[in-house]
Amino acid sequence: MDIQYLMRQAKKLEKAMADAKEKLAEIAVEAESGGGLVKVAMNGKCEVTRLTVDPKAIDPNDKAMLEDLITAAVNAAVEKARTAADESMSKATGGIKIPGIAG
């Protein structure tokens, strides 16, 4: 086995992974709950970039409903962001699964 070759391949993989990680911020996903009453935009790093709440969802007497809608929208966005990040990292690594790299 050629150690030099393996080292070159490892360096290529390392660079591809670093490039892919940088691009995670460029990935954009959106999710909603309550039929669009709450919308969340998130990047591939699972950072919320926008949260919108329709005024119809704001009921001072039902704070729990709004909290549930926000939670559901954020969780849906996180799932989409993780999936998109996993796909991006998989492309960078040629399909090699590396635990803990994305999401």
Swiss-Prot record:
Assembly information from the UniProt record: Homodimer.
Sorted UniProt keywords: Cytoplasm, DNA-binding
Residues spanning the signal sequence: none
Its biological purpose: Binds to DNA and alters its conformation. May be involved in regulation of gene expression, nucleoid organization and DNA protection.
Major place of residence: cytoplasm
Subcellular localization: Cytoplasm, Nucleoid
Species of the source: Anaeromyxobacter dehalogenans (strain 2CP-C)
Pfam families listed in its UniProt record: YbaB_DNA_bd (PF02575)
GO molecular function: DNA binding
Annotated protein name in UniProt: Nucleoid-associated protein Adeh_3636
GO cellular component annotations of the record: bacterial nucleoid; cytosol
InterPro entries with a match to the protein in the record: YbaB-like_sf (IPR036894), YbaB/EbfC (IPR004401)
Family: Belongs to the YbaB/EbfC family.
Source organism superkingdom: Bacteria
